[in-house]
Amino acid sequence: MMRRILPLLLLVGLLLTPTAPTFAQDDYTPPTDQPGPAVDTLYFKAFNVDRAPLDLEAGEMDMYYYNLKIAAARKLRDNQDVQLFEAPANTLSLVLNPAPAPEGQLNPFAIPAVRRAMQRLVDREFVAREIYQGQAAPMYTVNSPTDFDYLTVFDIIQEQDLRYDPEFARDEIAAAMEEAGAELVDGVWTYEEQPVRIKFIIRVEDERREVGDLVRTALEDAGFQVDANYQPFAPAIQTVYSTDPKLFGWHIYTEGWGRGAPNRYDFGSVNSYNAPWLGNMPGWQQTGFWQYENEELDELGKQLFRGEFQDKAARDEMYRTMTQMGLDESVRIWVATVNSAYAVAEDVTGITQDLAAGPRGLWTLRTAYKPESKELTVGHLWVWTERSTWNPVGGIGDVYSSDIYRQLSDPALWNDPFTGIPQPFRVSYKVESAGPDGKLAVPADAFLWDAKTGKWQTVGEDVEAISKVTYDYTKFFQANFHHGQQISMADLLYSLYQGFDISYNPDKAKIETVMAVTARPTLETFRGFRVLDENRIEVYVDFWHFDDNYIAAYGTPSSVGTPWEVLYTLDDLVFKQRRAAYSDTAAARYNVPWISLVLDRDARLVRKAMMDIRRAKGFPAAVFTLPGATASLTDAKAADLRYGATLDWFTDHGHLIISNGPFFLARYDPPAQFAELDAFRDPTYPFTAADLYKGTPQLIEFAAIDAESIVLGEAYEATFTLKGPGKLSLRYLLVDAATNAIIAQGDATAAGANKFSVELTEDETFDLDFGLYRLVLAATSDQLAQLTERQVEIEADLQ
C-alpha cells in the first residue's frame, strides 16, 4: 500500500495561513468612538527593504507595507515583538514584446511558437522553492492558485502540462526560429548574419532580480544573446509602459502586480492581462504606438466584462476560453504567486487580514492602533517615485501613491475581504433586473450626456435596459469633503459628465486617447440616469450577472472622491489651456506635465487656473442643469464658496488632494520620502473605527484524508473531511502521474457533515493502468473567495 499527501504546486492552506488568529476577532475595541479612524495620525516613511526588519525591531516604524524579502521574514518568525501577516498579495509575470522587428532584424517574441515555448523554459518550481524558499506558488494563468476562479480553469492548467521542460522548449524555439529564417551559429541564433539580441529589463528591488537572472540564463542556453538591464521601479515602468513597442527599448520585463481585494467572480483581470482593449497589453492603446491586437479575445472579453452570458455555466465557459486563448498567445508568462509577508509590531491591534491583500487592504489602517498611542508609522519601500503621479483622473496608478490614497478616499462599494463579493461601503443600492433575456423600460425622462450638444439629453421613448440600480448616496451627500464643503449630487454629475465627455467629445478623445478608447465599451452599456432626490439616483444599464451585487458594482456612477471644482479646473488645464495632461502617454506626446496635485509646481498651476476661473465667474452650468429641472443642482454663488474653500486648502496644506475618507493628507514631502495623514474627525463622517473592523477569516482545512491504494477492477472510494466556514464543496481531478493526463474529474459526493467522497466504479478502475495516480483536490466555501488545494498520490495495482 502506498499513500502520500503532497502539495499541488504548494500547500495553499499554508500559503494563506497567517501567524495571527485563524478566526475573526470579536473583542476589538478601538481607542475612540469619534468619527474617523482609530488613530489621529498616520506617518508614511520610506525604509530600505533590506534594513526594514532592523528598523521595525528598533521601533522606527509600526508596520512595513512593502513585502519583506523571504530570508528576512523567516528571521522574524521567532521574534515575539513582531507579528507576521502573510497573504498571496503579489504575483509575478514576464511580459513579452510581440512587435514585428524592422526589416533585416528578427524579434523572437513576435513568433507565437517562441512565446509559447517560454512557458516551459521558465522553471517556476525553482522560483517558488529556491528563490522564494517555499513562500511562493507556481502560477500558469492570471489566476493565482488561491483564487476562487482557479477552480474554473484548474483542469485546463493540468491539461496544458506547462511543467519546466527546457529541452522541449529549446526544440520548439529552434523549429520556430529556423522557420523564420534564423540560423544557430556556434550556439547563438543569428539572423542575416547578426546575432539575435534580447533586451531584458529586470527589476532590482526584490527577488525579481534573481528571477530575472534565472530567465536570462535560460534564454542564453536557448541560443539568444541577452542584454540584461537592471532597473528600479520608475525607469523600468517608463521604458516598458510609456514607449512604443516597435522602438524595442525592451523585449521582456519582470512584471510584479499587487492585489487590492479578493474577487469571487473575476472579469477584470482575465481581460486586462490577456485582451488588448483595456490598454494593458503591449501598445497600451496609445495612438501612434504599435498595438498587439486580438479581435477574438477583445470581443469575448467585452462580453464577459459586460455580463453578456446566460448563466454561471456560460460565464465560466467564456472565462475558460479566454484563459486558453491567453495561453495560446502567451504574451504574458505567469511565474508565481508570492506569499508576501508583512511585518507589524507586536503591540499593534485591529488588523484585518484581507484574503488577497493581507493587511495592505482597504481596512487595516482605518482600524489599527497601539495602546496608549494616537499615531502609527507605516514604512514602505518608497513614498514617492518619479512615476508617483497624484491626479484622480489618470494617476494614482502605482502602489506607492495608491497605498496612501486608499486611506484618504472612500469607495462607494468594495469587495468583502473574505467573500470577495461587492458590498455597500458608503452607498446602498437596490437592484432590479430582467436579465439575462428580458429588458426593462427606461423612463423617457432619463438622461445621458450628449457630447455633441454639450448638454444632458433625455433618452426619449422606447429605450430599454437589462437592469436598473437605485443608489442611495446619503452617507456621501450628508457628509463633507476634507475642505469642509458638503458632498452633493453636483459632484456625482460632474464625475459622470467628465467620463462621458472625455470619451465622446472628439477634441478631448484626441488628447486623452487611451482613456477614451478603453472607457467607451463600458460607457456604451449605460442607457440612462435619473436623479430621484438629493440623495438617490437611478442607473439603467445593459448588464446582467447571476449575483446582483456585481450588477450594482458595474453600474456605480461615482465614488465622488474629488470635489467637482477641482475636476473642472483640471479639465480646463488639460483640454482648454493644454498645459497639463491626465495620462503619462498624453503628457509625453504633447510635452506637458503629467499633472500631480501633490507637487508644488503642479498644484500652483491648478491654483492659478482656479483663481482665473473664479475671477471670471466661470461655472459649468450645463453640467448641473438637468432636462426639465426647475433649478440647477448648484449655482454660481455655491461655486464661489467651493473655489474659496479649495484655494484656502492649498494655502493651508500646499497641495490639492481633497477627498472624502477617514484621513486627510496633512503633509507630503517627496524629497524626504514622507507623508502625514491626519484623522478626519468631521462629525458628518459616517463611520467610526468599530464600524470597519473585519478581523481574520477562518480558512478551509483538510481535517482528515482516507485515500488508500486502488485495486484494479474493484470499486474505489476515497473520503475527505473538511473544516471551514459556510457551505463547503470539493472538486477533484484524477491524473495519471506518468502522462499528466486527466482520467476523471467532477464534484466529490457529500457524505455527511463536511465529509466528501470520490468514487470510481469497477469498470473505471479496470480501465486504469498499473502505476501512480494523483487526486488533485480543490475545496471551496460560499463564504470565502479562495480555495484550498491538496494532492494525494495513489498507487493502482492488482491488490
Range-by-range predicted roles:
Residues 30-74, 225, 478, 651, ...:
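Ligand-site clamp/hinge motif
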Residues 24-40, 78-79, 108, 187-192, ...:
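Surface-exposed, Gly/Pro/Thr- and Asp/Glu-enriched linker/hinge segments
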Residues 31, 269-272, 277, 281, ...:
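Long beta-strand-rich cores associated with HINT superfamily self-processing modules
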Residues 110-217, 321, 366, 374-379, ...:
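Append "and occasionally in soluble cytosolic enzymes with long acidic Gly/Pro-rich linkers
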Residues 35-36, 68, 73-172, 190-194, ...:
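Local pocket/hinge segments that shape ligand/substrate recognition
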Residues 116, 128, 227-237, 266-345, ...:
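Extracytoplasmic/peripheral linker and loop segments enriched in polar/acidic and small residues
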Residues 53-57, 61-73, 79-82, 221-280, ...:
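Periplasmic binding protein-like
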Residues 427-472, 579-656, 661:
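Long, low-complexity, polar/charged, intrinsically disordered or flexibly structured peripheral segments
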